[in-house]
Amino acid sequence: MNITITKKENPGKLPETDELGFGKYFTDHMFLMDYSDTDGWHNARIVPFGPVSMSPAAGVLHYGAEVFEGLKAYRRPDGGVQLFRPRENVRRINASCGRMCIPPLEPLVRPYRSAADQ
């Protein structure tokens, strides 16, 4: 799977480590991917963080069918990026998809690694 990456022109300032907290700070970027019956999951991309447009007729607004999995990545002392248990995250999100009757995602461990390398 190819992931198109569009980097934010002016990245935000990183918070101090003693100020971190869940839901308090957000990354400068977000991962998006489209789904259609004919193409399955496609058009994977990382874009600058921002509003997500959707139709008022979107099922998620009417029936609440959605899944979430919070993959974590940490900066290593050597400057590299370490993903925290990506295979387990993929298994959990696919299990959630199955429970919600949402098509499962393709195994995404390789694309996560590719994105972290960039």
Feature roles, as predicted:
Residues 1-118:
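Conserved alpha/beta cores of soluble small-molecule-handling proteins
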